Design a protein with these regions (language model features):
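A hydrophobic/aromatic-rich effector-binding and dimerization subdomain
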Residues: 1, 47-118, 137-146
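Generic protein-terminus/edge-of-domain signal
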Residues: 1-42, 49, 57, 78-85, ...
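Solvent-exposed, amphipathic alpha-helical segments
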Residues: 24, 104-118, 160-171, 215, ...
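Short hydrophobic/aromatic patch on the recognition helix
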Residues: 40, 191-196, 240-241
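All-alpha amphipathic helical-bundle segments outside canonical DNA-binding/catalytic cores
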Residues: 100-103, 117-134, 155
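Conserved hydrophobic/aromatic pocket- or pore-lining residues that grip, position, or stack substrates
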Residues: 135, 168, 192
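Short, Lys/Arg-enriched N-terminal segment that forms or immediately precedes the first helix
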Residues: 146-151, 198-200
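Terminal helix-turn-helix DNA-binding modules in bacterial transcription factors
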Residues: 166, 170, 175, 179, ...
Length: 242
């Protein structure tokens, strides 16, 4: 059946995402790969990586997501237990949590949520970081023991799609278009659009806009002017940007 947008492209400029799928009928796109998910499938996504679920059938969709700020990850890391390094190592890697590990993760996530909801009460901030550390350590220990099972059953994007992504990543601040990208790759615009949509679940132009908006978000945080941001990220028309 024809897939439907489950959401727009996701991108986080300063957060890691731990995603665990529980039920539904979706493909998930991250980095240069996609996977049809089953209960217990999980994914770690680093900051600045585009990712998205893509709904196959109109069924209930349930997942658990934990977002962790990059600075928190660095704070929790030690020379012996460098959580930051391991999350980077497993960026955009799919892995499957067996029932026992999945239930442990869900229990941990409930504790994180409990202390997040009461984080202004005495002790809750410390307990929040403690349970977050426990959850991340459990995940990394599981991955270390099951490295040979990472990215099983994935679909890797063809070179043409990967090259289109790389070209956009390198040139999105310039005056590019789907037509100019197609010319560079020596392929028709319609064929490129079809392939890109099929493998990524999104249009090529949406990918360009997403990259530009990510950079714009960073520059806004740096308190740059809107006009400066508009032209710096590749929008040649101020009205299009706002």
């Amino acid at each position: 059946s024809k897939g439907e947008d489950c959401s727009d492209l996701h991108i986080h400029s300063d957060q890691y995402e731990i995603y665990v799928f529980l039920r539904g009928d979706i493909d998930y796109f991250a980095g240069n790969i996609r996977k049809h998910l089953v209960r217990g499938d999980a994914l770690i996504v680093s900051p600045n990586e585009l990712h998205r679920p893509y709904l196959i059938k109109e069924t209930a969709y349930e997942r658990v997501i934990i977002h962790v700020n990059q600075d928190v990850i660095k704070k929790l890391s030690t020379p012996v237990s460098n959580i930051y390094r391991f999350l980077e190592q497993y960026n955009c890697c799919f892995f499957h949590l067996p029932d026992e590990i999945l239930n442990q993760f869900l229990n941990n996530e409930r504790m994180i949520q409990q202390y997040y909801n009461t984080k202004n009460e005495f002790g809750s901030d410390i307990l929040l970081e403690t349970w977050l550390s426990i959850t991340l350590i459990h995940l990394i220990q599981f991955l270390q023991k099951n490295q040979n099972k990472v990215n099983e059953g994935i679909t890797v994007f063809p070179d043409l799609v990967k090259n289109a992504i790389q070209y956009v990543d390198d040139h999105y601040t310039e005056n590019i278009s789907v037509a100019s990208i197609s010319r560079y790759l020596n392929i028709s615009s319609s064929h490129l659009n079809h392939l890109f949509k099929y493998y990524t679940g999104n249009t090529l132009w949406n990918y360009v806009i997403s990259k530009r908006m990510l950079m714009a978000h960073k520059m806004i945080l740096e308190q740059k002017s809107i006009t400066e941001i508009c032209y710096a990220v590749g929008f040649k028309n101020y009205s299009h940007f706002i």
